């Protein structure tokens, strides 16, 4: 997910730096980023296998993610501090939940005044240990929104308004902006 986000941003013409780790089998990923125009200065090459995800998409547009952490879960606080030292107030930091040290990354980015965007996928219980009050933008699907808020309703395509789910997220995180993705039905903000 992180690589896809960086590729999309770079292809859109946004100056993009991708930070993280790749394993011995991941050099092709750095090449994909470079070809898209993303900067890869902050990618570390580590021994072992690359992290990866398998995304299973259902006909209704929903997905299920199977994750192997690999090198993605080997970030160090020293590495985080080094990368963030190159950024400043007002710079965007886009995070997804496939890596480790997210709470630390968010704390340091918040101290610098960076704008934090969080896609909590793949959702797990650790998300509730993160300083979510520091998130400026959430990128959520319906299931993640329900999990974050405890809001237990169906969505519009199943008979109940999606606006109520978006309102629940906004109520839980009043200082954050929210993009709620709705599978084949698009998204709302």
Stretches with model-predicted labels:
Residues 82-83, 101-104, 125-128, 165:
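Short acidic active-site motifs
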């Amino acid at each position: 997910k992180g690589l896809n986000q960086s590729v999309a941003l770079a292809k859109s013409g946004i100056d993009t730096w991708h930070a993280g780790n790749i394993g011995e089998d991941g050099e092709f990923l750095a090449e994909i980023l470079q070809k898209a125009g993303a900067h890869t200065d902050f990618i570390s090459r580590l021994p072992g296998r690359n992290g990866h995800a398998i995304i299973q998409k259902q006909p209704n547009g929903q997905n299920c993610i199977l994750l192997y952490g690999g090198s993605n879960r080997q970030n160090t606080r020293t590495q985080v501090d080094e990368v963030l030292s190159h950024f400043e107030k007002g710079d965007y930091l886009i995070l997804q939940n496939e890596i480790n040290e997210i709470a630390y990354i968010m704390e340091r980015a918040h101290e610098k005044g960076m704008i934090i965007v969080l896609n909590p996928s793949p959702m797990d219980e650790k998300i509730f240990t993160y300083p979510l009050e520091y998130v400026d933008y959430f990128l959520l699907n319906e299931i993640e929104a329900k999990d974050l808020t405890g809001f237990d309703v169906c969505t519009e395509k199943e008979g109940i308004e999606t606006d109520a789910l978006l309102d629940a997220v906004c109520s839980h995180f009043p200082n954050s902006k929210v993009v709620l993705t709705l599978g084949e039905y698009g998204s709302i903000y």
